[in-house]
Curated annotation (Swiss-Prot):
Renumbered residue ranges of the record's region Disordered: 1-23, 493-530
A single GO BP: nuclear-transcribed mRNA catabolic process, nonsense-mediated decay
Protein name per the record: ATP-dependent RNA helicase DBP2
Residue ranges, compositional bias (Polar residues): 514-530
UniProt cross-references to Pfam families, sorted A to Z: DEAD, Helicase_C
GO cellular component: cytoplasm; nucleus
Family: Belongs to the DEAD box helicase family. DDX5/DBP2 subfamily.
Motif residue range(s): DEAD box: 251-254
Helicase C-terminal domain span: 318-478
GO molecular function: ATP binding; ATP hydrolysis activity; G-quadruplex DNA binding; G-quadruplex RNA binding; mRNA binding; RNA helicase activity; snoRNA binding
Length: 530
């Protein structure tokens, strides 16, 4: 899949499914994306859709594999039960168990096999037949479960079945995501698996110059991955349109609503023909997401992996220390000393505010720890650089706010430290879920203070379900219910369990690109530790 941002477009895509190239029955052709001379904005209004006059399009590409068709209802129920899979809706296709059973065209299957995946994930086993069948669907699964490929590969098949883009046409596939980091990661997957089809894509998000994004849209792209706010900017400026969109994805729908994007989502979806295929993906299923699905999905089918009851992964060791605010820094350093016993470990530290994020980063660097900060006040170029340094291990400690960390998928995070507790238990589970992925083990350390008392009951419930050791201070708090006052002192509990001693990160390199660094990321790095 060609990615304009990487400058590797080599020409138009091939038609794997055929179709009529003379696509001139009402889409596109709006005289280009130039907008007016002064880039005046035009308020978006909901089109009066006449489905009879809209060009027809194909969205059902699924043919059940003979091996899948031969399985008994008992076998299917056993498979779903084994993978904690539950489905809702009518005429739900049976799950597949291998890549070959999915029914992908050979050009897609070859891309998948080239990546060396042993087998589909649970969400892919059920999600692919659903998506390929053209149905509106809801997928509920944890972050890191393989949901991106669950909609990305069917999107490639969908695009190749549609007529080629004409000048002035907008995208065929639109993916909405809550953050620029997640949008970029989705784009990377789309580029990786669509290379043989020469499908073009671009990422449209805030915090970056509009010029390159506008040029990408003007050249024509089959896939747009966007954050809601920046996409509305482009639509109101006349730089793109959604008339060709027949495959819509809402990724991390719960997070988008948490971040207040519901009005923008509704405004965008109203610009898309109502007979499109819509796929909604979410880690949770709150009423707000249900209402959005009810308004925009037609006769949807749903697959859920795991229970709707909020739970933390059992591969994560949860350590909670009940301490005071002034003890946090000393405790943080002690845990970093423990974390460095694993040579190539990565540590993700969460802070509640941008100010705290910078203060912790500056403190750690002055103490000799190779830490970098990422939050919303950083320019996109610096955020990208920090993320690269963290992923490669050149800076193995990253301090982040919740918003900056949403959508970031980094492999090999061994430790998560909640320097500040989040405001709700859902964010706690989401934070600590950055470690212990894919069956690996991980450790999550949380500093619980008097200001976090409202979380006490829910935190005990999460830890108890995961069979974790609850420190006595937290147990006392749980018995007194919400709002109880905690007297600090005595043992902290939960500190053991993953070893002690100090190792090393193998040098202090990786800080050459100083032009990216601002604020706390420019704080001098002491040689005290390494």
């Amino acid at each position: 899949m060609n990615n304009y941002n990487n400058g590797d477009y080599k020409g138009g895509r091939e038609q794997h499914f055929g179709g009529n190239n003379n696509y001139n029955r009402g889409y596109g052709g709006n005289g280009g994306f130039g907008g007016n001379r002064y880039n005046e904005r035009v308020e978006l209004t909901t089109p009066d859709w006449d489905l009879e006059s809209l060009p027809k399009f194909e969205k059902n590409f699924y043919t059940e594999h003979p091996d899948v068709a031969a399985r008994s209802d008992k076998d299917i129920a056993a498979f779903r039960n084994e993978h904690q899979m539950s489905c809702l809706g009518s005429d739900i296709p049976h799950p597949i168990t291998t890549f070959d059973e999915a029914g992908f065209p050979e050009y897609v299957l070859n891309e998948v096999k080239a990546q060396g995946f042993p087998s589909p994930t649970a969400i892919q086993c059920q999600g692919w037949p659903m998506a390929l069948s053209g149905r509106d669907m809801v997928g509920i699964a944890a972050t890191g479960s393989g949901k991106t490929l669950s909609y990305c590969l069917p999107a490639i098949v969908h695009i190749n079945a549609q007529p080629l883009l004409s000048p002035g046409d907008g995208p065929v596939v639109l993916v909405l995501a809550p953050t620029r980091e997640l949008a970029v990661q989705i784009q990377q997957e789309c580029s990786k698996f669509g290379s043989s089809s020469r499908i073009r894509n671009t990422c449209v998000y805030g915090g970056a110059p509009k010029g390159q994004q506008i040029r990408d849209l003007a050249r024509g792209v089959e896939i747009v991955i966007a954050t809601p706010g920046r996409l509305i900017d482009m639509l109101e400026m006349g730089k793109t349109n959604l008339k060709r969109v027949t495959y819509l994805v809402l990724d991390e729908a719960d997070r988008m609503l948490d971040m207040g994007f519901e009005p923008q989502i509704r405004k965008i979806v109203d610009q898309i023909r109502p007979d499109r295929q819509t796929l909604m993906w979410s880690a949770t299923w709150p009423k707000e997401v249900q209402n959005l699905a009810r308004d925009y999905l037609q006769d949807p089918i749903q697959v859920r992996i795991g229970s709707l009851e909020l739970a933390a992964s059992h591969t994560i060791t949860q350590v909670v220390e009940v301490i005071s605010e002034y003890e946090k820094r000393d405790r943080l350093v002690k845990h970093l000393e423990t974390a460095t016993t694993e040579k190539e470990s990565k540590v993700l530290i969460f802070a509640s505010t941008k100010k705290t994020c910078d203060e912790v980063t500056s403190y750690l660097r002055a103490d000799g720890w190779p830490a970098l900060a990422i939050h919303g006040d950083k320019q996109q170029s610096e955020r990208d650089w920090v993320l690269r340094e963290f992923k490669t291990g050149k800076s193995p400690i990253m301090v982040a706010t919740d918003v900056a960390a949403r959508g970031i998928d980094v492999k090999g995070i061994n430790f998560v430290i909640n320097f500040d507790m989040p405001g709700n238990i859902e964010d706690y589970v989401h934070r600590i879920g950055r470690t212990g992925r894919g069956g690996a083990t991980g450790t999550a350390v949380s500093f619980f203070t008097d200001g976090n008392n409202k979380l006490g009951g829910d935190l005990c419930k999460i830890m108890r379900e995961a069979k974790q050791t609850i420190p006595p201070e937290l147990q006392r708090f749980d018995r007194k219910s919400f709002g109880a006052h905690i007297r600090y002192g005595g043992g902290r509990g939960g500190r053991g369990g993953y070893g002690r001693g100090r190792g090393g990160y193998g040098g202090r390199g990786g800080y050459g690109q100083r032009n990216y660094q601002t604020g706390s990321n420019q704080a001098p790095l002491s040689n005290r530790r390494f």
